[in-house]
Amino acid sequence: MPRLLSAVLLIAVLIVVATLPLVGAATFATRSAADTVNDDLGDIDANASLPLVSTITDRNGNVLARLYDQRRYQVASDRISDTVKDAVVAIEDRRFYDHEGVDVRGTLRALLANLTSGDVEQGASTLDQQYIKNYLLFIDAEDDADRDAATETSIARKLREMKLAIDLDRNYTKDEILTRYLNLVSFGNGAYGIETAARTYFDTSAADLTVAQAALLAGMVQSTANLDPYIYPDAALARRNTVLDAMVDTGYLSPAERDAAAAEPLGVLEEPRTEPSGCISAGDAGFFCDYVLSWLDDNGLDTAELATGGYTVKTTLDPATQEAAVAAVHTEAAADADGVSLSANYIAPTDNAHEVVAMASSRIYGLDADAGQTVLPLTHSALGNGAGSVFKLFAAAQALADGKVGLDDTLQVPQRIEVAGMGDGGAENSPVGMYCVENSGTYSSSMTLREALATSPNTPFIELEQKVGVDRIVDLAVRLGLRSYAEPGSFDGENSVVDVVKASNMGSFVLGPLAVDPLELANVSASLADNGRWCAPTPVLSVTDRDGRDITPDSGDCEQALDRKVANALANGMGGDAVSGTAEDAARAASWSGPVSAKTGTTESNLSAAFLGFIPGLAGATYAFNDGGSVQQLCTGPLRQCGTGNLFGGNEPARAFFTTLTATAGRYGGGKLPDVDSQYLRTGTVR
């Protein structure tokens, strides 16, 4: 500050004081002077909440990520050491406990000292005034203009600051003001508040700061830039010792205590302890963190509120399952593979929720696109070219529910069928107006529904689709978990998937040619594992606010999407895939030998592949798909884009699932496949 202007400011304040009657003492005089400014404490809401860090944890309380605008952890007075309070008072406002917001004696002393020296050697701002200035700068300011106004060099700002400081002193105790000040101010290196500063520089708490540590932090408030101990260690050390001297002068320390503290080195950490804001810091849980933020936003708690609110979000993520899921997808797919990735989601059905316990992608969650990193929601948004034959389970479920087929009934398996009224095209040489389907590979001419679910021929499921109707099958798919298919615009920005499928009577629906949300696919698995009951997938166990109040959003009611007996029959019927079906090799490779309900899926031309599976306590789905700018056929070993595709759901997708299941099944129980009510075993004939 130019010394002339500084002197003018101080003189201006004193002139205002001097023009008032002397009767009533200095306090009355300063209060009258301050009354020339119209603002009062209510105009800035000094009782407003400070911006605090919000924390996202896994289900065990381990921190996944933090979100903040200002990195601040607020603590109560009894969690701030008396030593740091004494240090701040000694160096910044030694008459703090005697004045009433504005220190007239200190102002006169500063004026005399500065005019005598010809420079600004002493300030005149009390801790109350500093609190007001910092509050206006860090809390009240909404834009650069407000921030400039909070720091401008003007008589008006100084008078306003004085008025508000007096109001502050009228409304709060000295300890409340000092605690607010220590929780508010910046200590540099992104640390706001004394608790954050203690963690940043010393990896300790505000309650446990030593005398030397407290003195260093108290001294830094004067100029965090010029007293940064990492950039200007000598200046920081000198300032710390000045604070120690001030503590002796004010009676807070004995000379011997001062000497002992002054003999200590700076003692700061080798580097300041920082905590990045956002999901990038969540590492392998980055995609899950992104999903949590999206879920919270959908449930009324947006990211902007999280960045200031000081919330604690305890999520459903199970660290052991997450570790296994991440390791499995990284084993099966390279993080930097061109144009293709592998996602995996796992859900644990509970009494009243479907808890997302793991979410993994072969991609790294990050901003380095050249290294294959991305922040796109690859694990929880509709993408790719579909889950393929996984969708056959919807036809099987509806046919079982309608009594059109039993698990042990015999289905005819023609190599090729042509059907009218279910779309055009399909296999080569399809007649005009006909939908033509062929099997991929060679099959017996007949087999049971169990065998068909395990080995996945195409033609019998198209015939089942004809019998029960496309409309009912797509409605069941939505009820079981593909809820986004019913959302307006989900197909082309204007029409929903459901509307388009029904309007065209899309025969190919049961062959899974449509983009799918990997998380929704996993929730279909969870609904079947949960005896046909759908619950919205949830990533959150609890949300508490800064005061510890539970504000957890209601995740909604569960629904019986499919009759319990039908769901159990289907789960039983899906038990052959890992034993003698398309997932047999993958299960064996992972040393999995227990019961599991499963279904593989591969789309036309091997553009994507999926796997869905579940045991009673854990359900999941994996999905390999084109995630780049071009759509190409996919190959296995390694997973990659290629000219002639040979990827199937029983390859990388199934292997990733079974590897994860082998590592984690003990955490979720297991047991035999569900029993089947006799009415779902045989109907006598396929009707």
Label the model's feature ranges.
Residues 62-73, 196, 200, 225-229, ...:
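Short pre-catalytic segments that frame enzyme active sites
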Residues 1-55:
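N-terminal type II signal-anchor transmembrane helix
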Residues 254-314, 323, 327-329, 339-340, ...:
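Non-catalytic structural connector segments
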